[in-house]
């Protein structure tokens, strides 16, 4: 069973079963790694917030992360998005550390499950939509009416824009889920080849495994970045009503 590349994505209960009616609230391995990701973030930035005359490596990492996200928000959503810095920063870090913890052997990749990524994406979608209506009222609906479109094509374009808008949580969640699941599946497959072929024939898949691991670490960062920057783009639409 452990040789099955899909076995690593199984969700199983840790501890007693907790159910309210038909709703299962049991603590699972997915819950554990979400909690661990949050704790690692809290520990790192708690250590990084200490005021030392000479910054240590943790402080430098915290400051670099702060500057990176701050610049991303400014470049993508503008000065009006600054009040939402804490949310974007927390979102990026949570997705990043969930991805990175999944790189540890025999761990669990939370973001390889569509239910996790979709809940995050749906929360962003609903939140951005609320911000848009609070900022512009029903004028927010102008987002679906591009300027300069001939009246004859306008009904079709509006329908396309609405469908595109409603598909945002789907595309945002599937992109992260699919990349993480595909990458970890390939790593497991090549790892299985190394074990099966042994010392003599296993050097080639081992080389691929090492290269794939490095690539997957890069993908883990890029997917967190893409998730955060798309959130900034959606926020920019809500705040500035650009099309």
What function would you assign to each model-found segment?
Residues 1-243:
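Selective transmembrane helix interface/packing segments
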